[in-house]
């Protein structure tokens, strides 16, 4: 009996592996900083309910640019929720507390909910429980004017992956989405 089960599994193994590989090729993108920003804009444009941006560090230029995107403006005017999770504006959490505090104020002034969380380095964007970006790019800090850093984001279209990551690594996720800016 065990040998039969093992034999059937080995026969199916390569087929399942190929299916998994094809699925992930279709549902996954590897994005450099410029590609990430373009993909994020497209996703915000199609936003149904919310976008959660987890960016430990903030840059004034990047935050202002984000707040002034037509896609962000449209989403907010339509009552969709944009939530940013970042570190508190104090040393040792951030290098420049003054700039960081200014960034959080700019976000709030635009109607974006800001949540401060200490001591985290995770970077991600979650859209409508179905799209997740994870990687090394701080979404609201990255600046690509002088050079493109060797950072990346992986974009997955997978409700199951969003569930898995939020349950295992972001237990506060549902609380962050409650309430308004």
Describe the predicted segments one by one.
Residues 1-17, 132-181:
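Signature of lipid phosphatidyltransferase scaffolds
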Residues 120:
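Conserved catalytic or regulatory cores that recognize and/or transform ribose-phosphate-containing ligands
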Residues 123-126:
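Short beta-strand scaffold segments in enzyme catalytic cores
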């Amino acid at each position: 009996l065990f040998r039969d089960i093992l034999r059937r599994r080995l026969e199916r193994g390569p087929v399942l592996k190929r299916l998994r590989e094809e699925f992930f090729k279709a549902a996954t993108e590897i994005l450099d900083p410029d590609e990430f920003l373009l993909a994020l804009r497209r996703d915000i444009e199609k936003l149904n309910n919310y976008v959660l941006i987890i960016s430990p560090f903030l840059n004034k230029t990047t935050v202002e640019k984000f707040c002034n995107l037509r896609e962000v403006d449209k989403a907010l005017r339509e009552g969709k929720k944009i939530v940013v999770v970042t570190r508190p504006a104090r040393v040792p959490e951030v290098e420049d507390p003054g700039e960081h505090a200014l960034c959080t104020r700019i976000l709030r002034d635009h109607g974006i909910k800001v949540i401060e969380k200490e001591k985290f380095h995770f970077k991600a964007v979650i859209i409508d429980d179905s799209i997740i970006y994870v990687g090394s790019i701080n979404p609201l800090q990255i600046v690509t004017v002088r050079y493109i850093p060797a950072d990346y984001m992986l974009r997955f279209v997978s409700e199951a992956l969003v569930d898995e990551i939020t349950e295992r690594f972001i237990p506060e996720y549902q609380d962050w989405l409650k309430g308004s800016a």
